[in-house]
């Protein structure tokens, strides 16, 4: 069985290494075909290989002009600023058709708890994550889709130096994705995909658990 890192690698191959593929540009309220994977390609219902070109957003105020646009967990200002960036990119005529959406740990970490980098999950608060999934991440995903952008949602933070099936970080990812994948606004969404783990480095050899079906 494939572990979570192998699945992620295969997704990256399908997403980033598409050669001789059809262009698919975005515009507001465009019809977006459901994509599926064939080998290392994303393919539309007619069998055309689709090449995605896009950009990333992370919803931390520090990473967005060093906190000059919003702070103190201001949801309204965060949405206004980041939706405005999408509008500006589309209005400029950039040939984009997907958004990599980081569910930044700024929102899900307990305030005031010191962490050692983005791979430190000691401050992760599941209730905060659920709250801001509904208030920040899903609204941003839906807004992007409304502009004709496919969305790839990535988990809060990045992988530690080593990850193995059954370890603390693996259990953290399972908890996050179990909730996200079962959310009624995300489950089976035709235009939203999941990046199971970010910046994985070394995976320890271990037996893999059976894959889950959501």
Regions found by a protein language model. Name each.
Residues 20-21:
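N-terminal signal peptide c-region/cleavage motif recognized by signal peptidases
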Residues 16-17:
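Cysteine-centered motifs
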Residues 1-12:
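Bacterial N-terminal signal peptides that target proteins for export
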Residues 24-26:
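Boundary at the C-terminal end of the N-terminal hydrophobic targeting segment
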Residues 29-214:
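Active-site mouth of glycoside hydrolases
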